[in-house]
């Protein structure tokens, strides 16, 4: 007698087979151009199970069918699966090179194509402001990301105080306000610096990009 053995994890609310994970990988690459590592299987289940539950669906197949036809759910799908790891001046030598380049060339447009929560474009803006000795410069800084949630955080410009710990004191004083009272433990990018950066939602797989060149 042959006994069929189910591969379903009995601890999971929804069935999640290898084929379901592969379909998620294909959908994310098709819609956002993002390659999802095979090591992310547990993360995918955890994050998308919440969406399946929220939409009162019964399976990953039903959910992906919804993603395929609903722009609003596609946005939720992408937001759920994008991982945003960033920090101010994350690669210091890049910003040293940028400062040198600004001194030697006529730069008019800078595009940060995966801006996440804004630390990188604001770091660029600090370097530009220092190079020109002013917040008012001829340089236009464009920052884009596919994730609408991280863009909202970037536009707000509010961060944990610990996130600027490695930034020199003179930059902290010039470019950030420290929170008080209920905002203690937070910092906010000064308005003059925020105004130097234009944030846009943009999918790099789209045929046309809402970014005007030339870019430096």
Predicted regions and their residues:
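Conserved AdoMet
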Residues: 2-111
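Conserved strand-to-helix beginnings and helix N-cap segments that scaffold or border functional pockets
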Residues: 41, 92, 121-125, 155, ...
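Short, well-ordered amphipathic alpha-helices
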Residues: 97, 121-131
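Conserved hydrophobic/aromatic pocket- or pore-lining residues that grip, position, or stack substrates
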Residues: 98, 115, 154
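Active-site catalytic pocket residues across diverse enzymes, especially alpha/beta-hydrolases
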Residues: 102, 128-132, 158
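Conserved class I S-adenosyl-L-methionine
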Residues: 107-123, 140-142
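Extended basic-aromatic, gly/pro-enriched interface segments that bind polyanionic ligands
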Residues: 109, 134-216
């Amino acid at each position: 007698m042959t006994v069929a053995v189910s591969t379903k994890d009995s601890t999971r609310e929804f069935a999640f087979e290898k084929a379901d994970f592969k379909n998620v990988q294909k959908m994310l690459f098709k819609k956002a151009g993002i390659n999802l590592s095979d090591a992310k299987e547990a993360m995918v289940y955890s994050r998308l199970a919440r969406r399946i539950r929220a939409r009162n669906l019964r399976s990953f197949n039903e959910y992906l069918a919804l993603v395929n036809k609903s722009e609003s759910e596609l946005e939720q799908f992408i937001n759920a699966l994008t991982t945003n790891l960033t920090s101010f001046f994350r690669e210091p030598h890049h910003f040293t090179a940028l400062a040198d380049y600004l001194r030697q060339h006529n730069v008019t447009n800078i595009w940060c194509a995966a801006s996440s929560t804004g630390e990188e474009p604001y770091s660029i803006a600090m370097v530009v402001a220092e190079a020109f000795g002013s917040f008012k410069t001829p340089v236009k800084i464009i920052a884009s990301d596919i994730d609408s949630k991280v863009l909202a955080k970037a536009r707000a410009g509010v961060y944990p105080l610990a996130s600027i710990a490695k930034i020199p004191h003179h930059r902290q004083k010039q470019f950030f306000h420290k929170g008080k009272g209920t905002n203690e433990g937070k910092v906010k990018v000064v308005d003059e610096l925020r105004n130097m950066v234009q944030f846009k939602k943009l999918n790099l797989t789209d045929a046309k990009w809402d970014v005007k060149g030339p870019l430096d």
